[in-house]
């Protein structure tokens, strides 16, 4: 039941509040206080759940209560009166991104310095906490609620977007220390499995105004979001097609320098090989994200990665490095390599 009497103004259904309180709206409304409490701390504050739970608490009867947004909701004497607004967005503004706890709220203050990362086009923001960032191609707009950082450089303001490794396999690979991503400014990238365009938007930042990203996504629902991202970013070309049939979009895509693939499909090796035959320059590169459970959920992840690498070699995709994406994703690996390398003299 949770502590029934805990909600200061609890009244009536307060009991249910404790238990039902996790959903914020707390049983019988009385849960306001208790609800706020459950909502607030319940799921570790921050993030999506905490915040929302709290607000629900507000509706449930704690009046403006839960508004404490995950903060201390119910504690504030009047079911949150004190909480009201507290931290606004979920526990103290943490949890920007919802999934994966977001960027953890980039705490920079005034002393943020931007350093170039060894991958061209990627940067590191150094502040109270360090973050991986890319230079915003469309200053003033965000794509998925990520944090933005403005830095003045010789009188001109440059805006950077925090790149969250829990939302992006490529960011996870970069933070995991991948040797090469093969996407320098000005390069052309074919991105298979673009989804809603979260990572695509960062690749668009990295390759910059001279580069191009061909973003292929089969799902119409994600495709809608992708097209909205592409409306603002002139260097993204959205293609709502099945990556298994590259001939369907051959008239849209020129030769590319790099293929990035994040298609969680059992035959993704074949999908990449087909697209490479159509669009990848000889000596061009590929970066493939492999989710072990999507290919064979019964085998050990390591065995799955090894067999995928064997298949690639058979398709003239020559892997050069492989790394796992721990601690950001479980049972994922990224394989980077070269396509039809020129014969050694």
UniProtKB/Swiss-Prot annotation:
Pfam family of the protein (one): Fibrillarin
Keywords from the named record: Methylation, Methyltransferase, Nucleus, Ribonucleoprotein, RNA-binding, rRNA processing, S-adenosyl-L-methionine, Transferase
Asymmetric dimethylarginine, modified sites: 9, 23, 25, 41, 43, 49, 52, 59, 64, 72, 78, 84, 89, 94, 99
PROSITE patterns, A to Z: FIBRILLARIN
Post-translational modification: By homology to other fibrillarins, some or all of the N-terminal domain arginines are modified to asymmetric dimethylarginine (DMA).
SMART domains, sorted: Fibrillarin
A Gene Ontology term for the protein's cellular component: small-subunit processome
Protein's UniProt keywords contain rRNA processing: yes
Binding site for S-adenosyl-L-methionine: 198-199, 217-218, 242-243, 262-265
Reactions it catalyzes: L-glutaminyl-[histone H2A] + S-adenosyl-L-methionine = N(5)-methyl-L-glutaminyl-[histone H2A] + S-adenosyl-L-homocysteine + H(+)
Protein name: rRNA 2'-O-methyltransferase fibrillarin
Organism: Drosophila erecta
Gene for this chain: Fib
């Amino acid at each position: 039941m949770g502590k029934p009497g805990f909600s200061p103004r609890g009244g009536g259904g307060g009991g249910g509040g404790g238990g039902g309180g996790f959903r914020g709206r707390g049983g019988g409304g009385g849960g306001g206080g208790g609800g706020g409490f459950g909502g607030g701390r319940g799921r570790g504050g921050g993030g999506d759940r905490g915040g929302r739970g709290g607000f629900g608490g507000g509706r449930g009867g704690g009046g403006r209560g839960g508004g404490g947004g995950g903060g201390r909701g119910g504690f504030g004497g009047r079911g949150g009166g004190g909480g009201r607004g507290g931290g606004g967005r979920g526990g103290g503004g943490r949890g920007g991104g919802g999934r994966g706890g977001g960027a953890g709220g980039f705490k920079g203050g005034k002393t943020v310095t931007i350093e170039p990362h060894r991958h061209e086009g990627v940067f590191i923001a150094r502040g109270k906490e360090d973050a991986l960032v890319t230079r915003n191609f469309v200053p003033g707009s965000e794509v998925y609620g990520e944090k933005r950082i403005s830095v003045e450089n010789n009188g001109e303001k440059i805006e950077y977007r925090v790149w969250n490794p829990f939302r992006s396999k490529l960011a996870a690979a970069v933070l995991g220390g991948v040797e090469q991503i093969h996407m320098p400014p000005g390069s052309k990238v074919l991105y298979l499995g673009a989804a809603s365009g979260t990572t695509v938007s960062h690749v668009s930042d990295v390759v910059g105004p001279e580069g191009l990203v061909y973003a292929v996504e089969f799902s119409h629902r994600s495709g809608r979001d992708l097209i909205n991202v592409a409306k603002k970013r002139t260097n993204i070309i959205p293609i709502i097609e099945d990556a298994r049939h590259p001939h369907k979009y051959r008239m849209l895509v020129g030769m590319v320098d790099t293929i990035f693939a994040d298609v969680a499909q059992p035959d993704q090796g074949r999908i990449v090989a087909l697209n490479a035959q159509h669009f990848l320059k000889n000596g061009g590169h590929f970066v493939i994200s492999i989710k072990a459970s999507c290919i064979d959920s019964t085998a050990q992840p390591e065995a799955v990665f090894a067999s995928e690498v064997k298949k690639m070699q058979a398709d003239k995709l020559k892997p050069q490095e492989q790394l796992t994406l721990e601690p950001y994703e479980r049972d994922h690996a990224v394989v980077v390599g070269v396509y039809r390398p020129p014969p050694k003299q």
